[in-house]
Structure formats: structure tokens, C-alpha cells
Amino acid sequence: MRLGALTGLDVAGKVTGFALDHRKVAPGCVFGAFRGRRFNGEDYIDAAVAAGAIAVVTREGVAVPGALALPADEPRRRFALLAGKFFAPFPGTCVAVTGTNGKTSTVELTRQLWRMAGHSAASIGTLGVTTASETVTTGLTTPDVVTFLANMHGLAREGVGHVCRH
């Protein structure tokens, strides 16, 4: 996808992916530089740009030498919206399950009910990404936004129309 089409700005370049970890940046990636509890993504902007980041989403006032700065009052939200546009399309029916107990069971039962009703369905959660043919263990109860959106895109590409997750 062209960077200008993704951002709505008059800029050149091709976006090849999204990354939250500077070690996963490849040429053409959009890097999300966010402050966290343990790490500050802003400390890794230079490394991300050196690895080929084409743009960096961060808070207002943060310098991004060598790449397009995409500042925002809510940088995580802007990053997620841009990534969503990049990874689209997604399955048409998506259900999220929240609560304290029973999420994994509810998600898996929902996937099985959809399958029994004739829908191509998947679930995402503690068990990993489960479809009718396989379960891919992710090791994450809640994947980060890039992993989640990439998984959703992959499921849609495989013809999955219904996804339930927690």
C-alpha cells in the first residue's frame, strides 16, 4: 500500500508492514513508538529508522530523523487505525468476549456452533488461533494490535467469515 494512500498525506513510499518492536522492523514498515511501563518505544526510533522504517507513529513533539513522523495525541489509536487500513479486509462477523471466567470456553463453543451452522469460523485467544483445520499456538492470551490484525487478515484471506475472540 502506498504511504500517501494510507495516511492521506502527499508523501511517497510503499508501506510493507507494521511493527511495535524495533527488532521486527523491515524496510517499509510503520513503527509504533509508544511509552510503556517497562520500555519507551521512543528510545528505539533511531534503530527502527536504521532498519528501514518509512514512518513512525508517536506522540506530538517527538523527533523522527530520517522517516516520516506521524504524531498524534493518541498515538496508539492512530497506529491501530492505520494498521487496520493496511491489513483490511477482515472477516465479516467478529465477536469479542469479555469477563472474568469462561472466556476461552465461550469463544471455542461459539466457533464450534458457527461451524455446525455451516459457517467458516475461527477463534482467537488463550488456545491460539483455531480454525476447522488447525490450531496455531501463539503463546499470547491477547495478541498485540499488529499480530491481531495480521491474523484477522489472514483468516479473511483463507475464507473465514466468522471470528470470536477474547
Model-derived regions, located:
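Phosphate-binding loop of NTP-binding sites
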Residues: F79-H166
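N-terminal leader/targeting and accessory segments in enzymes
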Residues: M1-K85
